């Protein structure tokens, strides 16, 4: 497997991405879970094939998990840059 080059981050960028990841893992996942639950409950009376809200919630979940994975990859392979490196 090829080793990817590290992502170059400032200290501020690292902190921002770390906060975003924590937010997505907690609040983001909670919100998507609630949205999925609500769409599922609302869909009990409808035909699941035509449940647009359930499909939208599943898409939101896929996007969220993709972003979490992307941030994990960045934060597992980064290099802090400083002004003297620029």
Model-derived regions: residue spans:
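Anionic-ligand-binding alpha/beta catalytic cores of soluble enzymes and soluble regulatory domains
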Residues: 55-82
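N-terminal cationic and glycine-rich segments that engage phosphates or anionic surfaces
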Residues: 1-59, 63
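Glycine/charge-rich, flexible interdomain linkers and switch-proximal surface loops
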Residues: 45-51, 78-86
